[in-house]
Amino acid sequence: QGLAELERRVGVPLFERHGRHTRLRPQATEVLAHARRVVAETRDLARWAETRRTGAAGVVRLGTIDAVAVHYRAEAIRRHRRAVPGLDLRLTVAPSGALFDALLVGDLDLVVCVEPTGPIAGVAMSPCLDESLYAYAPDGAHGRPPEEWGPWVTYPRGSHTREVIAAGLAALGAPFAVVAESNQPEVLREMVRLGMGWAVLPAAQAEAGAEPLARVRRRPVGVRHLVVARRADVVSDAAVDA
């Protein structure tokens, strides 16, 4: 019945009977070759669909702040790339504000950044980790009470981290007179070493390298909360979820 249906659909006699046996006609060779290609391509499609369903392939556009990409999740990112070689993981490192902007316009699928002070419409966030921020001073300036701290080198206006720092210093009664700005913690660290000002930084970046900065006090000035964020209105993607 199946062979008869195939002949009917193709419109060309494909088989002939020889006694009890059915044989392919010569003109059926091309049809058979085509059928084999279709079966192979169908299997390829099934394998592709399986990798998409399980997250073993596809494109993931991940955005993170520098501390996440360099210090906290660098090994996890490398391990995931090795474990899922079919995944095209594209990493963007930028400040939190720029990452949220890129997420909202669809340029990124997932971001790991500093939690904003309030909710952002259309964005779903979940906790990632908490990061303590400590005060650091140039050589010879340690030992002062908070009222005499500064001046400061810090993140630019609009930075989520700067908002955390400003609130923490205000709670301590420390002035927040800013003399220089940079989005890069490593640059701020070098400014402190050069004596340009004080800074509040994550320990992972301030105390790294051959010449680590020394904390002004053991307790942190503040804590910034890092979150994993994605657009709330997008269809679930196994590669992103992984």
Residue positions per predicted region:
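Residues within the DNA-recognition helix of helix-turn-helix
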Residues: 1-5, 76
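Alpha-helical linker/hinge and terminal dimerization helices associated
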Residues: 9-10, 31-53
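Secondary-structure junction motif
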Residues: 114, 136, 149-173, 194, ...
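Central regulatory/effector-binding core of bacterial HTH transcription factors
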Residues: 57-119, 181-182
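A ligand-binding cleft/hinge motif common to bilobed small-molecule-binding domains
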Residues: 114-121, 185-214
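A short LG(V/I)-centered, amphipathic sequence patch enriched
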Residues: 4-24
